[in-house]
Amino acid sequence: MKDKTGTENVGKFYNELKECIECGNCTFWCPIYQQRPEEKYVARGKNQAIRDLLTTKGEYSAEMKDMLSMCTLCSTCAQHCPVKSKFQSIMIGARADQTKAKGLGLLPWLIYRQLIPRRKLFGSVVRCASYFQKLFMPKAEGRMRHLPLFLSGLLQGRLIPAIADCYLRDLVPETNKVSSGTQTRYKAAYFMGCATDFVFPEIGKKLIEYLTRNGVEVIVPKEQGCCGAPIWLGAGDFDTGRTIADTNVKIFNEADYIITNCATCSSAMKEYAKYLADTDARLRRYSDFSKKVYDIS
């Protein structure tokens, strides 16, 4: 029974599935389709495949898994769609149903359920990765590093950002008062996000300094973790996503404003209610939480 198709989540967006007029306009804009011009990798093809899957009560095959994974959720197709189909919602729902039906697999299970939700453990693993990076990844311009030679050839010499020597949570206090001689106008909690915390802490530090100079007292809860975007938006693990969302709601419960400089974090947290709320209580909590979130990037 576990392999059978689930429709609990994607079924909520069945009307969006029916909106597609199969005009093919998405083929001109999809970044995945530009690299892999196959019908199954563009919104039109995915829409049809998901409709067929729901109609026939089929199963999530390996081909379907591959098709669902080939989407960055950039919404470029939706922005240029003549009927404004909300394809992103369809993809997120289908990924959740696929994960519920087929499971995550060992490596994603280790990363998304056992590592990322445990912030201290995650930070320790990232710290170990930073040592590996210094040993085997030559430094390039600025804060970027080359992949090791044996991978660089396979991945076209790509660069990745260097992991910071000191995380943001270790650079700033939990309570950051406004600058001397400045009147406190607002009090806001700061959601760092993984990239700012581990890779670009100087951005977060400068943001806090700017806000405190302009009358904003900034609280940085040290127990905060990931927004959950890679887990429930990317991997479709709604169960772990709810656990993370519940934790964030609890940590930031007393905040009047929640600010972040990460667009991914802000968009993910604002969508908790739409995708993850499976009870009336969660719907209320997530809705109240999302109203406090502000992207200040």
What are these regions, as identified by a protein language model?
Residues 28, 48-52, 66-69, 75, ...:
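N-terminal, well-ordered alpha-helical segments
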Residues 5-17, 57-68, 178-179, 212-214:
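Short, intrinsically disordered, charge-biased short linear motifs at domain edges
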